[in-house]
Curated annotation (Swiss-Prot):
GO BP, one annotated term: lipid catabolic process
Catalytic activity annotation: an N-(acyl)-sphingosylphosphocholine = an N-(acyl)-sphingosyl-1,3-cyclic phosphate + choline; an N-(acyl)-sphingosylphosphoethanolamine = an N-(acyl)-sphingosyl-1,3-cyclic phosphate + ethanolamine; a 1-acyl-sn-glycero-3-phosphocholine = a 1-acyl-sn-glycero-2,3-cyclic phosphate + choline; a 1-acyl-sn-glycero-3-phosphoethanolamine = a 1-acyl-sn-glycero-2,3-cyclic phosphate + ethanolamine
Cleaved signal peptide residues: 1-18
CDD domains documented for this protein: GDPD_like_SMaseD_PLD
Name of this chain's protein: Dermonecrotic toxin LiSicTox-alphaII2
Protein location: Secreted
Organ and tissue specificity: Expressed by the venom gland.
Organism: Loxosceles intermedia
Binding site for Mg(2+): E58, D60, D118
Molecular functions per Gene Ontology: lyase activity; metal ion binding; phosphoric diester hydrolase activity; toxin activity
Disulfide bonds: C78-C84, C80-C224
């Protein structure tokens, strides 16, 4: 009798393990999605949008006359039905962000895994300040977010620049982290040009910057205006090239369920939205639940998605 029970339990254990493996395999086949809360410029909003299901945020960064990051602020005009005026001093915001993304901190949110800094380099006094802006940004992040490399925030960072001619901002950022002895932190940093330029021009700007990895590509417009998906399709096609440098594509700003569905239908990796809960609801629908899942910290945002086994 005891032998029979042992055999039954053993078989049940094997079957259970097999079922768990099947579930894990099905999850691996799903495209991870970064649910990106738009215009998160106050510390309180990190937690507000996280509670709505965001696993990523986008934050606006303005610079002072000396090309130092000064505020997290968008201002008027901004998206329809949003308060455009939330703000923090940049370094103070970084401290709040570090608290929200550092395991063990009482304010830690384990789902918050990526931050897009929308760098308002078009507000610099001179184009020649772009490199200095990158240097100053690196120093601010190093001290106030990464805590000088000592148990800082763990979120991945995407530096998003609106103008191709400001590619030197990326160079200044990278040079500074290397000079400060923290080149390893570049593994946490990605890049994006957000001006909806031609993909070929964007690739040339990255060539000039000396960057060929960790590249996201955005496409979109304010939620006040409809935008089609022609350029999204171009970006996705560029991503799918065997030797293409683009690894992830995200669309902004998608607030309606219909827009979210269209974006997912084009196989984007990220959706920037004013309503992360809308994206959550769409991914609960069987058609989308079978193909997509929300990204976690274990998903590498610098790697092209490949279905399990391919």
């Amino acid at each position: 009798m005891l032998l029979r029970i042992a055999l039954i339990l053993g078989c049940w254990s094997i079957l259970s393990e097999g079922a768990e493996n099947d579930i894990a395999e099905r999850e691996d086949r799903k495209r991870p999605i970064w649910n990106m809360a738009h215009m998160v410029n106050a510390i309180s909003q990190i937690h507000e949008f996280g509670a709505l299901g965001a696993n990523s945020i986008e934050t606006d960064v303005s610079f002072d006359k000396n090309a130092k990051p000064e505020y997290t602020f968008h201002g008027i005009p901004c998206d329809c039905f949003r308060n455009c005026m939330n703000w923090e001093y940049f370094n103070h915001f970084l401290e709040g962000l570090r608290n929200a993304t550092t395991p063990g901190n009482p304010k830690y949110r384990d789902r918050m895994i990526l931050v897009v800094f929308d760098l308002k380099s078009n507000g610099l006094y001179y184009d020649a300040q772009a490199r200095d802006a990158g240097k100053n940004l690196a120093l601010s992040l190093l001290q106030n977010y990464w805590n000088n490399g000592d148990n800082g925030g763990r979120a991945y960072i995407v530096l998003s620049v609106p103008l191709l001619k400001h590619y030197e901002l990326f160079q200044g950022f990278r040079e500074t982290l290397k000079e400060q002895g923290h080149e390893e932190l570049l593994e946490k940093v990605g890049y994006d040009f957000s001006g909806n330029d031609d993909i070929s021009d964007i690739e040339e700007a990255y060539r000039l910057a000396g960057i060929s990895e960790h590249i996201w590509q955005s496409d979109g417009i304010t939620n006040c205006i409809y935008r089609g998906f022609d350029r999204v399709i171009q970006a996705v096609n560029a991503r799918e090239k065997f030797e293409g440098i683009i690894k992830k594509v995200y669309f902004w700003t998608a607030d309606k369920p219909s827009t979210v569905k269209l974006a997912l239908g084009e196989s984007v990796d990220g959706i920037m939205t004013n309503y992360p809960n809308v994206v959550v609801d769409v991914l609960k629908i069987d058609e989308y639940q079978q193909r997509f899942r929300f990204a976690t910290i274990d998903d590498n945002p610098w790697e092209k998605y490949k279905p399990y086994g391919k």
